[in-house]
Amino acid sequence: MEDIVIATNNQGKINDFKAIFKNQHVIGISELIEDFDVEETGATFEENARLKSEAAAHALNKRVIADDSGLEVFALNGEPGVYSARYAGLGKNDEDNIEKLLTNLEDVQDRRAQFVCVISMSAPNEKTKTFKGTVSGVITTERHGKNGFGYDPIFFVPELNKTMAEITNDEKGKISHRGNAIRLLKEYLEGEQHV
């Protein structure tokens, strides 16, 4: 099987793919193209993932995988959604984003939410395929745990009775939105080999 090229410079995302594609060579796009960047102008996770994978597949003339992910809070009509990384504004960090979300949920009873990841796979002269993974949870009123990043310290998973920041990387890989989407992609690729 060919190398798995991921259109990201985020080492954490690359590691998530490597954890599931253990027997294959997974590389980030920066190993093939310097300064690859695509503006995420899509209104959905799928649109943003497609923008990245299609641009990278065109630039490299080979199959490329990209993803877009974020947090959707039901009581906030899906916010922060595609703006999860920049919810508090450009130049702000994870703490600023968490603070804004907690403020927006201050008097809200329904704190149900989900992390969403859409993986897009594009190749020259092939239809782009997408794979969606989710994990459901509840937004806490305060931070718990030190692992992970982003909204993990306030995303409580009832089945585990912990936030995403309180579980190990191995546990997270088994239940996370990105892990779920990567497993769907892997099943598809394994099926492709048997055709």
From Swiss-Prot:
Cofactor remark: Binds 1 Mg(2+) ion per subunit.
InterPro entries: dITP/XTP_pyrophosphatase, ITPase-like_fam, RdgB/HAM1
Binding residue positions for substrate: T8, N9, N10, Q11, G12, K13, S69, F149, G150, Y151, D152, K172, H177, R178
Active site positions: D68
Gene Ontology CC terms, in alphabetical order: cytosol
Binding annotation for Mg(2+): E39, D68
Keywords: Hydrolase, Magnesium, Metal-binding, Nucleotide metabolism, Nucleotide-binding
Top-level taxonomic group: Bacteria
Cofactors named for this entry: Mg(2+)
Any one biological process term the GO annotation gives: nucleotide metabolic process
Reaction catalysed by this enzyme: XTP + H2O = XMP + diphosphate + H(+); dITP + H2O = dIMP + diphosphate + H(+); ITP + H2O = IMP + diphosphate + H(+)
MF terms in GO: dITP diphosphatase activity; ITP diphosphatase activity; metal ion binding; nucleotide binding; ribonucleoside triphosphate phosphatase activity; XTP diphosphatase activity
Top enzyme class: hydrolase
Similarity remark: Belongs to the HAM1 NTPase family.
Quaternary context: Homodimer.
Protein function: Pyrophosphatase that catalyzes the hydrolysis of nucleoside triphosphates to their monophosphate derivatives, with a high preference for the non-canonical purine nucleotides XTP (xanthosine triphosphate), dITP (deoxyinosine triphosphate) and ITP. Seems to function as a house-cleaning enzyme that removes non-canonical purine nucleotides from the nucleotide pool, thus preventing their incorporation into DNA/RNA and avoiding chromosomal lesions.
Annotated HAMAP family: Non_canon_purine_NTPase
Protein's name in the database: dITP/XTP pyrophosphatase
